[in-house]
């Protein structure tokens, strides 16, 4: 997700830059579709699709790099602006429906508006602090990796704790998984042909991130299948009792 200055790119990278640009375009398409799908699914199921902490972190990231540190190509800026707009819709459905998911925790339920505000403010300051520490260009990439892992963990934990597929679907999973997965070929191209500015993409930490991302999101698909099978068995058992 690093917004590298293409004017510094070596000739070898320029020959394959169109592939990297296509990957970024597909990333935007995948995540845009995911956001729109989450809004629809949340309104339909009267719940929220993204766990609260990752949602606030992701919203703060979009806010930081669409409004506070807008930079990059026109395509990058449009992607951030549009992503922020859709994230506002995702946030709206979460605020609207969160109370229904927290009946088991009255203290949390009564203070959900404050929790949203505090979490968004805290994550925004975290993104800003990282941008001031290492520069917006690298901070955008590193914090995006962090957002992705938090989202993957949050989605898996939310699915298992609910024991229900409400707010979730294979389509939503595939859109976000594909939207993040397609950036890996882009990073490989940058590391291979533009290593001077992308040395960290061959680091143990980056390899660990990719491995954990694949493990978590792959596990999510399996868990969603298991939860849906359990729901189907429960429904069949209810029908059998009513006969």
Curated annotation (Swiss-Prot):
Function: Terpene cyclase; part of the gene cluster that mediates the biosynthesis of the diterpenoid pyrones subglutinols A and B. The first step of the pathway is the synthesis of the alpha-pyrone moiety by the polyketide synthase dpmaA via condensation of one acetyl-CoA starter unit with 3 malonyl-CoA units and 2 methylations. The alpha-pyrone is then combined with geranylgeranyl pyrophosphate (GGPP) formed by the GGPP synthase dpmaD through the action of the prenyltransferase dpmaC to yield a linear alpha-pyrone diterpenoid.
Species assigned in the record: Metarhizium anisopliae
Keyword hit for Nucleotidyltransferase: no
EC top class, as a word: lyase
InterPro entries membership: PaxB-like
Entry's localization field: Membrane
Record's keyword terms, sorted: Lyase, Membrane, Transmembrane, Transmembrane helix
Use of this protein: Diterpenoid pyrones display various biological activities and subglutinol A shows insecticidal and anti-HIV activities.
GO MF term set: lyase activity
Designated gene of the protein: dpmaB
GO biological process: terpenoid biosynthetic process
Membrane topology classification: Multi-pass membrane protein
Pathway note: Secondary metabolite biosynthesis; terpenoid biosynthesis
Coiled-coil regions listed: none
EC number of the protein: 4.2.3.-
Protein name as catalogued: Terpene cyclase dpmaB
Cellular component aspect of the GO annotation: membrane
Membrane-spanning parts: 11-31, 51-71, 112-132, 141-161, 169-189, 207-227
Domain of life per record: Eukaryota
Pfam families hit by this protein: Pyr4-TMTC
Main location: membrane
Family: Belongs to the paxB family.
Listed PANTHER family: PTHR42038, TERPENE CYCLASE AUSL
């Amino acid at each position: 997700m690093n917004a590298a200055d293409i004017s510094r790119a070596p000739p070898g990278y320029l020959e394959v830059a169109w592939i990297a640009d296509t990957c970024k375009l597909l990333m935007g398409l995948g995540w845009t579709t995911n956001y729109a799908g989450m809004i629809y699914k949340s309104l339909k199921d009267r719940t929220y699709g993204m766990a609260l902490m990752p949602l606030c972190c992701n919203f703060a990231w979009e806010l930081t790099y669409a409004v506070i540190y807008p930079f990059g190509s026109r395509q990058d800026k449009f992607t951030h602006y549009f992503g922020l707009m859709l994230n506002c819709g995702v946030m709206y459905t979460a605020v609207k429906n969160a109370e229904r998911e927290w009946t088991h925790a009255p203290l949390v339920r009564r203070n959900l508006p404050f929790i949203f505000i505090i979490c968004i403010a805290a994550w925004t300051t975290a993104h800003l602090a990282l941008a001031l520490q290492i520069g917006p260009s690298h901070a955008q990439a590193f914090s995006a990796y962090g957002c992705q892992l938090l989202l993957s963990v949050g989605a898996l934990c939310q699915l298992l704790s609910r024991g229900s597929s409400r707010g979730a679907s294979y389509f939503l999973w595939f859109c976000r998984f594909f939207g993040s997965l397609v950036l890996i070929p882009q990073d490989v191209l940058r590391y291979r042909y533009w290593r001077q500015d992308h040395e960290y993409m061959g680091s143990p930490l980056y390899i660990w991130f990719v491995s954990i991302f694949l493990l978590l999101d792959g596990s999510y698909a399996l868990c969603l299948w298991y939860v849906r099978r359990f729901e189907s068995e429960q429904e069949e058992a209810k029908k059998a009792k009513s006969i």
